């Protein structure tokens, strides 16, 4: 679920709104209702780094945390994927940081250290944002949360997706052959969940998430796949939450999309091993974390 999830959501919205003439006008109210439903403000401490308002309408640098949440049944779940995106429209650039889910760090508000993805189980998106913000020492202005269990509805809404699979494997009840394959929503969910059979581990899983997301963007970019736009909007409404307002989404789609032209993917260096309690953690050296902090703060033009 790499960088383009943000512009996939905004892109579909943009296609629906500015796609053309009476068709776009006729569905405006449906899109507007969907955006109202997915809006969920953050609860922040007053001293949070991300509380200072970023003026998206004036194209100021901005940061967004993307959370892929694995919720099954009545379980609250954990953040299956954590990706921080920084956008600087002044030089049309974007940086995306994939944060390993097993990263050992302080869980803000819990009074202890644990795997970073546990923050969501302890305190939802509010605690997740606060924890990542402290871990990287950068302000997080906005978030987009996607329920990965319901992600299959989004894939099915665009008619399934095609991907090129570089590793044959089985996951759940599905077999995934090597090469070009078509995925239904249920298959896409299993495809993006597998990591234990992949020698690349969590990084391989993140790559598959990116493949599926890019394929969804490709399908969503054509009107032929959006004739059932109601299904797309329903899937988004049920499975996406964000503190971006409707106006901010439209401004971002308009003012920030060129940032894709100059994109840098960043993997956090570290070492994974079992701790004394027998639990596997991913440890990030302080020097490596500080280098990353400096790079992100410079990209966001943060000086204090």
Curated annotation (Swiss-Prot):
Pathway(s) where this gene product acts: Cell wall biogenesis
Keywords, ordered alphabetically: Cell membrane, Cell wall biogenesis/degradation, Membrane, Signal-anchor, Transferase, Transmembrane, Transmembrane helix
InterPro entries, sorted: LytR/CpsA/Psr_CW_biosynth (IPR050922), LytR_CpsA_psr (IPR004474), TagU (IPR023734)
EC number: 2.7.8.-
Any single Gene Ontology cellular-component annotation: plasma membrane
Ranges facing Cytoplasmic side: 1-4
GO biological process terms held by the UniProt record: cell wall assembly
Chief localization: membrane
Residues annotated as transmembrane: 5-25
Compartments, record wording: Cell membrane
Ranges facing Extracellular side: 26-304
One Gene Ontology molecular-function label: phosphotransferase activity, for other substituted phosphate groups
Membrane topology: Single-pass type II membrane protein
Keyword Transcription regulation applies: no
PANTHER family attached to this UniProt entry: POLYISOPRENYL-TEICHOIC ACID--PEPTIDOGLYCAN TEICHOIC ACID TRANSFERASE TAGU
Main function: May catalyze the final step in cell wall teichoic acid biosynthesis, the transfer of the anionic cell wall polymers (APs) from their lipid-linked precursor to the cell wall peptidoglycan (PG).
Family of the protein in this entry: Belongs to the LytR/CpsA/Psr (LCP) family.
Protein name per Swiss-Prot or TrEMBL: Polyisoprenyl-teichoic acid--peptidoglycan teichoic acid transferase TagU
GN (gene name): tagU
């Amino acid at each position: 679920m790499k960088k383009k999830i943000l512009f996939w959501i905004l892109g579909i919205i943009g296609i629906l709104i500015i796609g053309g003439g009476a068709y776009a006008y006729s569905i405006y109210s449906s899109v507007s209702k969907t955006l109202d439903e997915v809006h969920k403000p953050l609860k922040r401490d007053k001293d949070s780094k991300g509380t200072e308002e970023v003026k998206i309408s004036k194209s100021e640098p901005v940061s967004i945390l993307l959370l892929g949440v694995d919720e099954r049944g009545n379980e609250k779940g954990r953040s299956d994927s954590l990706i921080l995106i920084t956008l600087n429209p002044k030089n049309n650039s974007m940086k995306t940081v994939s944060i390993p889910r097993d990263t050992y760090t302080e869980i803000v508000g819990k009074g202890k250290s644990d795997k970073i993805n546990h923050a969501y189980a302890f305190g939802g998106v509010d605690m997740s944002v606060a924890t990542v913000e402290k871990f990287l020492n950068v302000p997080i202005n906005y978030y987009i949360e996607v329920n990965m269990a319901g992600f299959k509805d989004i894939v099915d809404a665009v008619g399934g997706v095609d991907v090129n699979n570089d590793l044959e494997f089985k996951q759940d009840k599905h077999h995934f052959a090597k090469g070009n394959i078509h995925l239904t929503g249920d298959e896409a969910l299993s495809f993006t969940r597998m990591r234990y059979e992949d020698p690349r581990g969590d990084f391989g899983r993140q790559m598959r998430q990116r493949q599926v997301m890019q394929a969804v963007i490709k399908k969503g970019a054509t009107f032929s796949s959006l004739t059932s736009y109601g299904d797309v909007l329903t899937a988004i409404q049920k499975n996406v939450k964000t503190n971006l307002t409707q106006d901010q989404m439209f401004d971002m789609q308009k003012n920030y999309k060129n940032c894709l032209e100059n994109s840098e993917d960043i993997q956090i260096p570290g070492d994974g091993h079992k701790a004394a309690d027998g639990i596997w953690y991913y440890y990030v050296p302080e020097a490596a974390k500080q280098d990353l902090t400096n790079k992100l703060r410079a990209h966001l033009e943060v000086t204090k």
